[in-house]
Amino acid sequence: MKYEVRCSACGQTSHNLLYFQCSSCGKPLDMQLHFDFETRKICRNDFSVWRYRRFFPYVNRDEIITLGEGWTPLVRLSDSVHVKLESLNPTGSFKDRGSTVLISAIHELIKRKRGYISEDSSGNAGASMAAYATRAGLKAKIYVPENVSGPKYTQIQSYGAEIVKVAGSRGKVAEKACKQEPRKFYVGHILHPLFRDGIRSLSYEIAEQLDWEIPDRIYLPVSAGTLMLGVISGFKHLADSNVTKSTPKIVTCQTRQVSPLYHRVKNLSYTPPDEVTSIADALVSVNPPLLELMAKNLREVKGGAVMVEEEEILEAFKELAMKGFFVEPSSAVAYAAYTKQVMNKETSSDSNVVIILTGTGLKTTLRSK
């Protein structure tokens, strides 16, 4: 199976799976697939991300690092709405999809160099990367914002990772994590193309669980863009391979405070807040490094963007809990956006919809009552 890791700006090919940016121009790298998805190649006795291992050709089968992630339930909420319970992944969020693929692809390379990994995260990705690193026998150093959520901090710490708290913006955290040190390999989930590529397994699952009938719309929360880019890649791969007839409309959902993508696709100016205080504390990327790539991909699939208010997020959080789904407020942003569009008659309540619930409520200190 052919694939290429290419620069999203100048098009130069990278041949080193450890690289996260172009060696020529410094811009982000992107995974390009040059093979079809074939349903006959699904490993049907495997109910994890690695059910689709034949579509991740850069990972050696005997080097896979897994905690049983993926194949999460797709639960019917109403006649036309399903929710995808990514909160039931091993570390409690969708980030495990990216971590299993990235760590599986590179852990032996890092071990041969006697190195360790570094990552920057507001919580979920740090916890996920720490878990898969320890599973692989790698040391991990996780850089987190000074105001990181208590439960997420505890989770990262429990996996044995070294934690470095960084004052200042989310960008400052990434800057520290990227800083070169002996034997340190930066595997930041935002910039590393293999992490984003691992997320496309989510699209394969949704399609297979719906018997390859694509929903009209997918609602998902957006911060740095790894989820939306991975989901778009997966659905495009299925459509390009003629497994599905089309791609769904991807609806990206953001908070008013953190809405750079919403403003970009609406051609509006965006002024980020001095401090992010939203209850959706996993959505913090006010200046995402992949913003241009996000906007380009969203336009290509004729996607949409919705911005929600704090009170709408809180109401959605409470409503989901009363339906039996205890998710973190950042997940509730997607449900809030869906209900807002139905109320405003921007979508039909009869449209077939999948809402991705990205993380567990066990990681939040917010209460539904």
What role is predicted for each listed range?
Residues 1-369:
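PLP-dependent amino-acid enzyme catalytic core
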